[in-house]
A protein has these predicted regions:
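N-terminal ligand-binding/catalytic initiation module
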Residues: 1-106, 114, 121-124
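Short helix-loop-beta connector
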Residues: 120-127, 149
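Glycine-rich Rossmann-fold phosphate-binding loop(s) that bind the pyrophosphate
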Residues: 133-134
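N-terminal Rossmann-fold NAD(P) dinucleotide-binding loop
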Residues: 137-138
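Aromatic pocket-lining residues of Rossmann-like dinucleotide-binding sites
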Residues: 144
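NAD(P)-binding Rossmann-fold cofactor-contacting core
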Residues: 147-173
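Rossmann-like adenosine-cofactor binding region
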Residues: 175-201
Length: 201
C-alpha cells in the first residue's frame, strides 16, 4: 500500500469545521469514558528561539490507526508552528499518511477551545472577547460562532493593525460586529466568554 501525502493547501480544502466539531466532541467523550493509550509529549529547546515537540501516540476508539505528530514552534515566523503528522496502521505500524500539521494543529486547538467554552459558559453568553489576533484567535472565534449565536465580539492584540484587520475580516466573514479594542481590559469588559490566543505574558 502506498503512503498518502497531504500538503497544507489540501488539508485546508478538505477539512470541514462542523464535521471536525462533531468528531472532536465525540473524541473527548470517548477519552473520558473509556481506557485510552496514554499519550506522551516530548519537548526540547532548539538553538535560538525555536522549540521542537513530538506528540505520540494519538488514538481513538474504533480507528485502527495511531498518529505521531512532530512539530517546531518559532514565535517570530508565520506560521509559527510547522510540522507533520504521521498516521500509522495500529496492527502493523505501516505508514498510511503524512500530513502537514500546521492547519490541523490550529483547527484542533481552536475547536477544542470553542467546545470547552460552549460546555462551560452560561447559555446566555453571547458577547465574546479574543486576546490575540493571530491564527488561533481567528480559529477560536470562527469555531465558537459555529456553535453559538454571537451578538458581538471584541479583539485586542499588541499589534493594533493586526487587531484592526482581524475585526474587519471576521466582521465580514461571520456577519457580526467585531471591534478592535485599545487594551485587553477594554476587550474583556462585559464579555461573557474570553478566549486567550497569544504567547504574550
Amino acid at each position: 500500500m502506498s503512503t498518502l501525502l497531504l500538503i497544507r493547501s489540501e488539508i485546508e480544502s478538505l477539512l470541514d469545521p462542523m464535521t471536525l466539531l462533531a468528531g472532536l466532541r465525540q473524541a473527548f467523550i470517548d477519552y473520558s469514558t473509556s481506557p485510552a493509550t496514554k499519550a506522551h509529549r516530548v519537548r526540547s529547546q532548539l538553538p535560538g528561539l525555536g522549540t521542537a515537540t513530538v506528540l505520540f501516540p494519538g488514538t481513538t476508539p474504533g480507528v485502527p490507526a495511531y498518529s505521531v505528530k512532530v512539530h517546531a514552534k518559532f514565535p517570530g515566523q508565520s506560521p509559527a508552528i510547522r510540522g507533520v503528522l504521521c498516521l500509522h496502521d495500529v496492527e502493523t505500524g505501516e505508514l498510511l499518511a503524512v500530513m502537514d500539521s500546521t492547519h490541523l494543529t490550529a483547527m484542533r486547538t481552536g475547536l477544542a477551545g470553542a467546545l470547552a467554552a460552549d460546555v462551560l459558559a452560561c447559555t446566555e453568553a453571547d458577547t465574546v472577547a479574543v486576546i490575540g489576533a493571530g491564527v488561533q484567535g481567528r480559529c477560536q472565534l470562527r469555531s465558537f460562532a459555529a456553535l453559538r449565536r454571537i451578538h458581538k465580539a471584541s479583539v485586542y492584540d499588541v499589534v493594533p493593525e493586526r487587531a484592526a484587520t482581524f475585526a474587519r475580516e471576521l466582521s465580514s466573514e461571520l456577519g457580526l460586529a467585531v471591534e478592535a479594542a485599545e487594551s485587553a481590559a477594554d476587550a474583556v469588559r462585559g464579555a461573557g466568554v474570553v478566549f486567550t490566543a497569544t504567547w504574550a505574558r
